[in-house]
Amino acid sequence: KIANSHATITITNHFRPDYSSCHVVDYDTITNKALKMDTHQGYSSTSAWARGQAWGLYGYTMMYRETQNEKYLQQAINIAKFILHHPNLPEDKIPYWDFDAPNIPDEPRDASAGAIIASALLELGQYVNDDKLSKEYQSVAAQQLRTLSSDEYLAAPQTNGGFILKHSVGNKPRNSEVDAPLTYADYYYVEALLRYKTVSYTHLRAHETVLDLV
């Protein structure tokens, strides 16, 4: 009940008409009224912080899995559309730390956001009834995993402090963990690899090179 309430209120108060989301919403503690949108780790209160968009996609996909409530599935589909069709999403599908960062393309990428998105898309692709959408999600996720598994992002053994992935961004406005490894980047990368390996995607197996790591 609490999770459903939180997810529904978040749709109302965190998301914009284009299905991007803000990082923080300030509430009146007496009336519970939403007072303003803000950010803590994003570029601005009106920007689309990349990992925040990834969390939203992952979260509403999970909410649909647990509840079978179609409104959560539709929310996940809408968030995926915002992410995948954003003009600032690079060709290799690993986002900049914020979709609205001011110096794109000279901004850090966030491998953690890419890993979260890939894992979410692989799950979401199983739930949608539209075969075209399912193929798009699965193909983008596979592309993200190939990118993250390249020398650009995948650390050599016994380097990178023992972490798997390079080039994540924790909190750029406060210059914390910028272009750094992050534990949760590794977690969602491994989760996405396992999902890619264990879920049967016929069109991917037929037309895409299967990742050597899986």
Where are these regions (language model features)?
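Long, well-ordered core segments of solenoidal/helical folds
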Residues: 2-20, 29-36, 75-92, 139-158
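Carbohydrate-binding/catalytic loop surfaces
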Residues: 18-49, 92-116, 157-181
